């Protein structure tokens, strides 16, 4: 005989409870780590792909990407760029075999201040997915939430029907501009905001509800829901499960396999912390941002300015490491090294 409903409910993992009111997304390039947690979607970034590309399990994908880059030919730089785009798409396509929803694939962070280059690179990634038999409805293109990135997202959505995930989002200004651009989804960061406050203020620990990253996402969620924006809010970059639980009820949350594992083992009761109903009574006031107002408001937030800049540099550095790794694999033999 099965246990009583009350007992069964008590034994339900925090992860299963979370899935009842939030879409759970796996934040990893290691697609073999996804199965156990049964997420709806998955997100990748240059750092995660770099880590996965160094694992023995994924060397076939790396070899396939290298072969593709060589086959297209052209200058060495062009071959490497094509190999990297292909590698991102190969990982994305494999991840899609394991999830019912969408995968996020990131445009090179070094293009973060070049709208046209971001649009072109995004369209190229979608074309590569198409060649792999994957339709654009299953892809989210990740772009840095600079002014240029947000405008690239607007153009991709409106003119090309390409869905965008705006990443490296730390300020309320970035969130408002993304909502006004009508992008599909935003990824406001939580843990990196906490990191900044721990490093730059006297306060070194926070209860989850007081966590500055949690408060930032809560404010954005309430603003979006109060004013009827359709853009999905997906909290990202978590340092602990307390932050995740404090954002239960958010549209989506993207979570690393390590923290998904902790939530799976956790049987404590979980209730939604965010809701559309509560958002209606929040004290948000609607604002409109043109480029000048956006730049001013974003610049007023020291944490956001530093973390956006830092995030772009980190993703760019990992893109360069990936390039070096592929360059070595592609050209070292023929250079007689």
Curated annotation (Swiss-Prot):
Annotated keywords: Acetylation, Cytoplasm, Nucleus, Pentose shunt, Phosphoprotein, Schiff base, Transferase
Entry domain remark: The first 10 amino acids are essential for nuclear localization.
GO molecular function: identical protein binding; monosaccharide binding; transaldolase activity
Disruption phenotype: Deficient mice develop normally; however, males are sterile because of functional and structural defects of mitochondria. Mice spontaneously develop hepatocellular carcinoma. The liver of these mice present an accumulation of five-carbon sugarphosphates and a depletion of NADPH and GSH.
Source species of the chain: Mus musculus
Phosphoserine sites (modified residues): 237, 256
Stored InterPro entries: Aldolase_TIM, TAL/FSA, Transaldolase_1, Transaldolase_AS
Protein name: Transaldolase
Record text on subunit structure and interactions: Homodimer. Heterodimer with isoform 2. Interacts with KPNA1 and KPNA4.
Pathway assigned in UniProt: Carbohydrate degradation; pentose phosphate pathway; D-glyceraldehyde 3-phosphate and beta-D-fructose 6-phosphate from D-ribose 5-phosphate and D-xylulose 5-phosphate (non-oxidative stage): step 2/3
Reaction equation(s) it catalyzes: D-sedoheptulose 7-phosphate + D-glyceraldehyde 3-phosphate = D-erythrose 4-phosphate + beta-D-fructose 6-phosphate
Top EC class for this record: transferase
Keyword Transferase annotated: yes
Family label: Belongs to the transaldolase family. Type 1 subfamily.
């Amino acid at each position: 005989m099965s246990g009583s409903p009350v007992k069964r409910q008590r034994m339900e993992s925090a992860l299963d409870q979370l899935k009842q009111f939030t879409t759970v997304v796996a934040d990893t390039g290691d697609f073999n780590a996804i199965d156990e947690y049964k997420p709806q979607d998955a997100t990748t970034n240059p750092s995660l792909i770099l880590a996965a590309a160094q694992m023995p399990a994924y060397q076939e994908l790396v070899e396939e990407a290298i072969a593709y880059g060589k086959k297209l030919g052209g200058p060495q730089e062009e071959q490497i760029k094509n190999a990297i785009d292909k590698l991102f798409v190969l990982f994305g396509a494999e991840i899609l075999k394991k999830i019912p929803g969408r995968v996020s694939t990131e445009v090179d962070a070094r293009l973060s201040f070049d709208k046209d280059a971001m649009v072109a690179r995004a369209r190229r990634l979608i074309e590569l997915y198409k060649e792999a038999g994957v339709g654009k409805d299953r892809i989210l293109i990740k772009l840095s939430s600079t002014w240029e990135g947000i405008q690239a997202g607007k153009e991709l959505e409106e003119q090309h029907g390409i869905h965008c995930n705006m990443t490296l989002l730390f300020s309320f200004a970035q969130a408002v501009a993304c909502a006004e651009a009508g992008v599909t989804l935003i990824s406001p960061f939580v843990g990196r905001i906490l990191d900044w406050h721990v490093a730059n203020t006297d306060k070194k620990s926070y209860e989850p509800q007081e966590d500055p990253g949690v408060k930032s996402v809560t404010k954005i969620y309430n603003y979006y829901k109060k004013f009827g924006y359709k853009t999905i809010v997906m909290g990202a970059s978590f340092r602990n499960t307390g932050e995740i639980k404090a954002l239960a009820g958010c549209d989506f949350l993207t979570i690393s396999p390590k923290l998904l594992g902790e939530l799976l083992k956790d049987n404590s009761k979980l209730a939604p912390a965010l809701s559309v109903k509560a958002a209606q009574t929040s004290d948000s006031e609607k604002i409109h941002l043109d480029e000048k107002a956006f730049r001013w408001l974003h610049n007023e937030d020291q944490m956001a300015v530093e973390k956006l800049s830092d995030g772009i540099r980190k993703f760019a550095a990992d893109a360069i490491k990936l390039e070096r790794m592929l360059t070595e694999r592609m050209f070292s033999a023929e250079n007689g090294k």
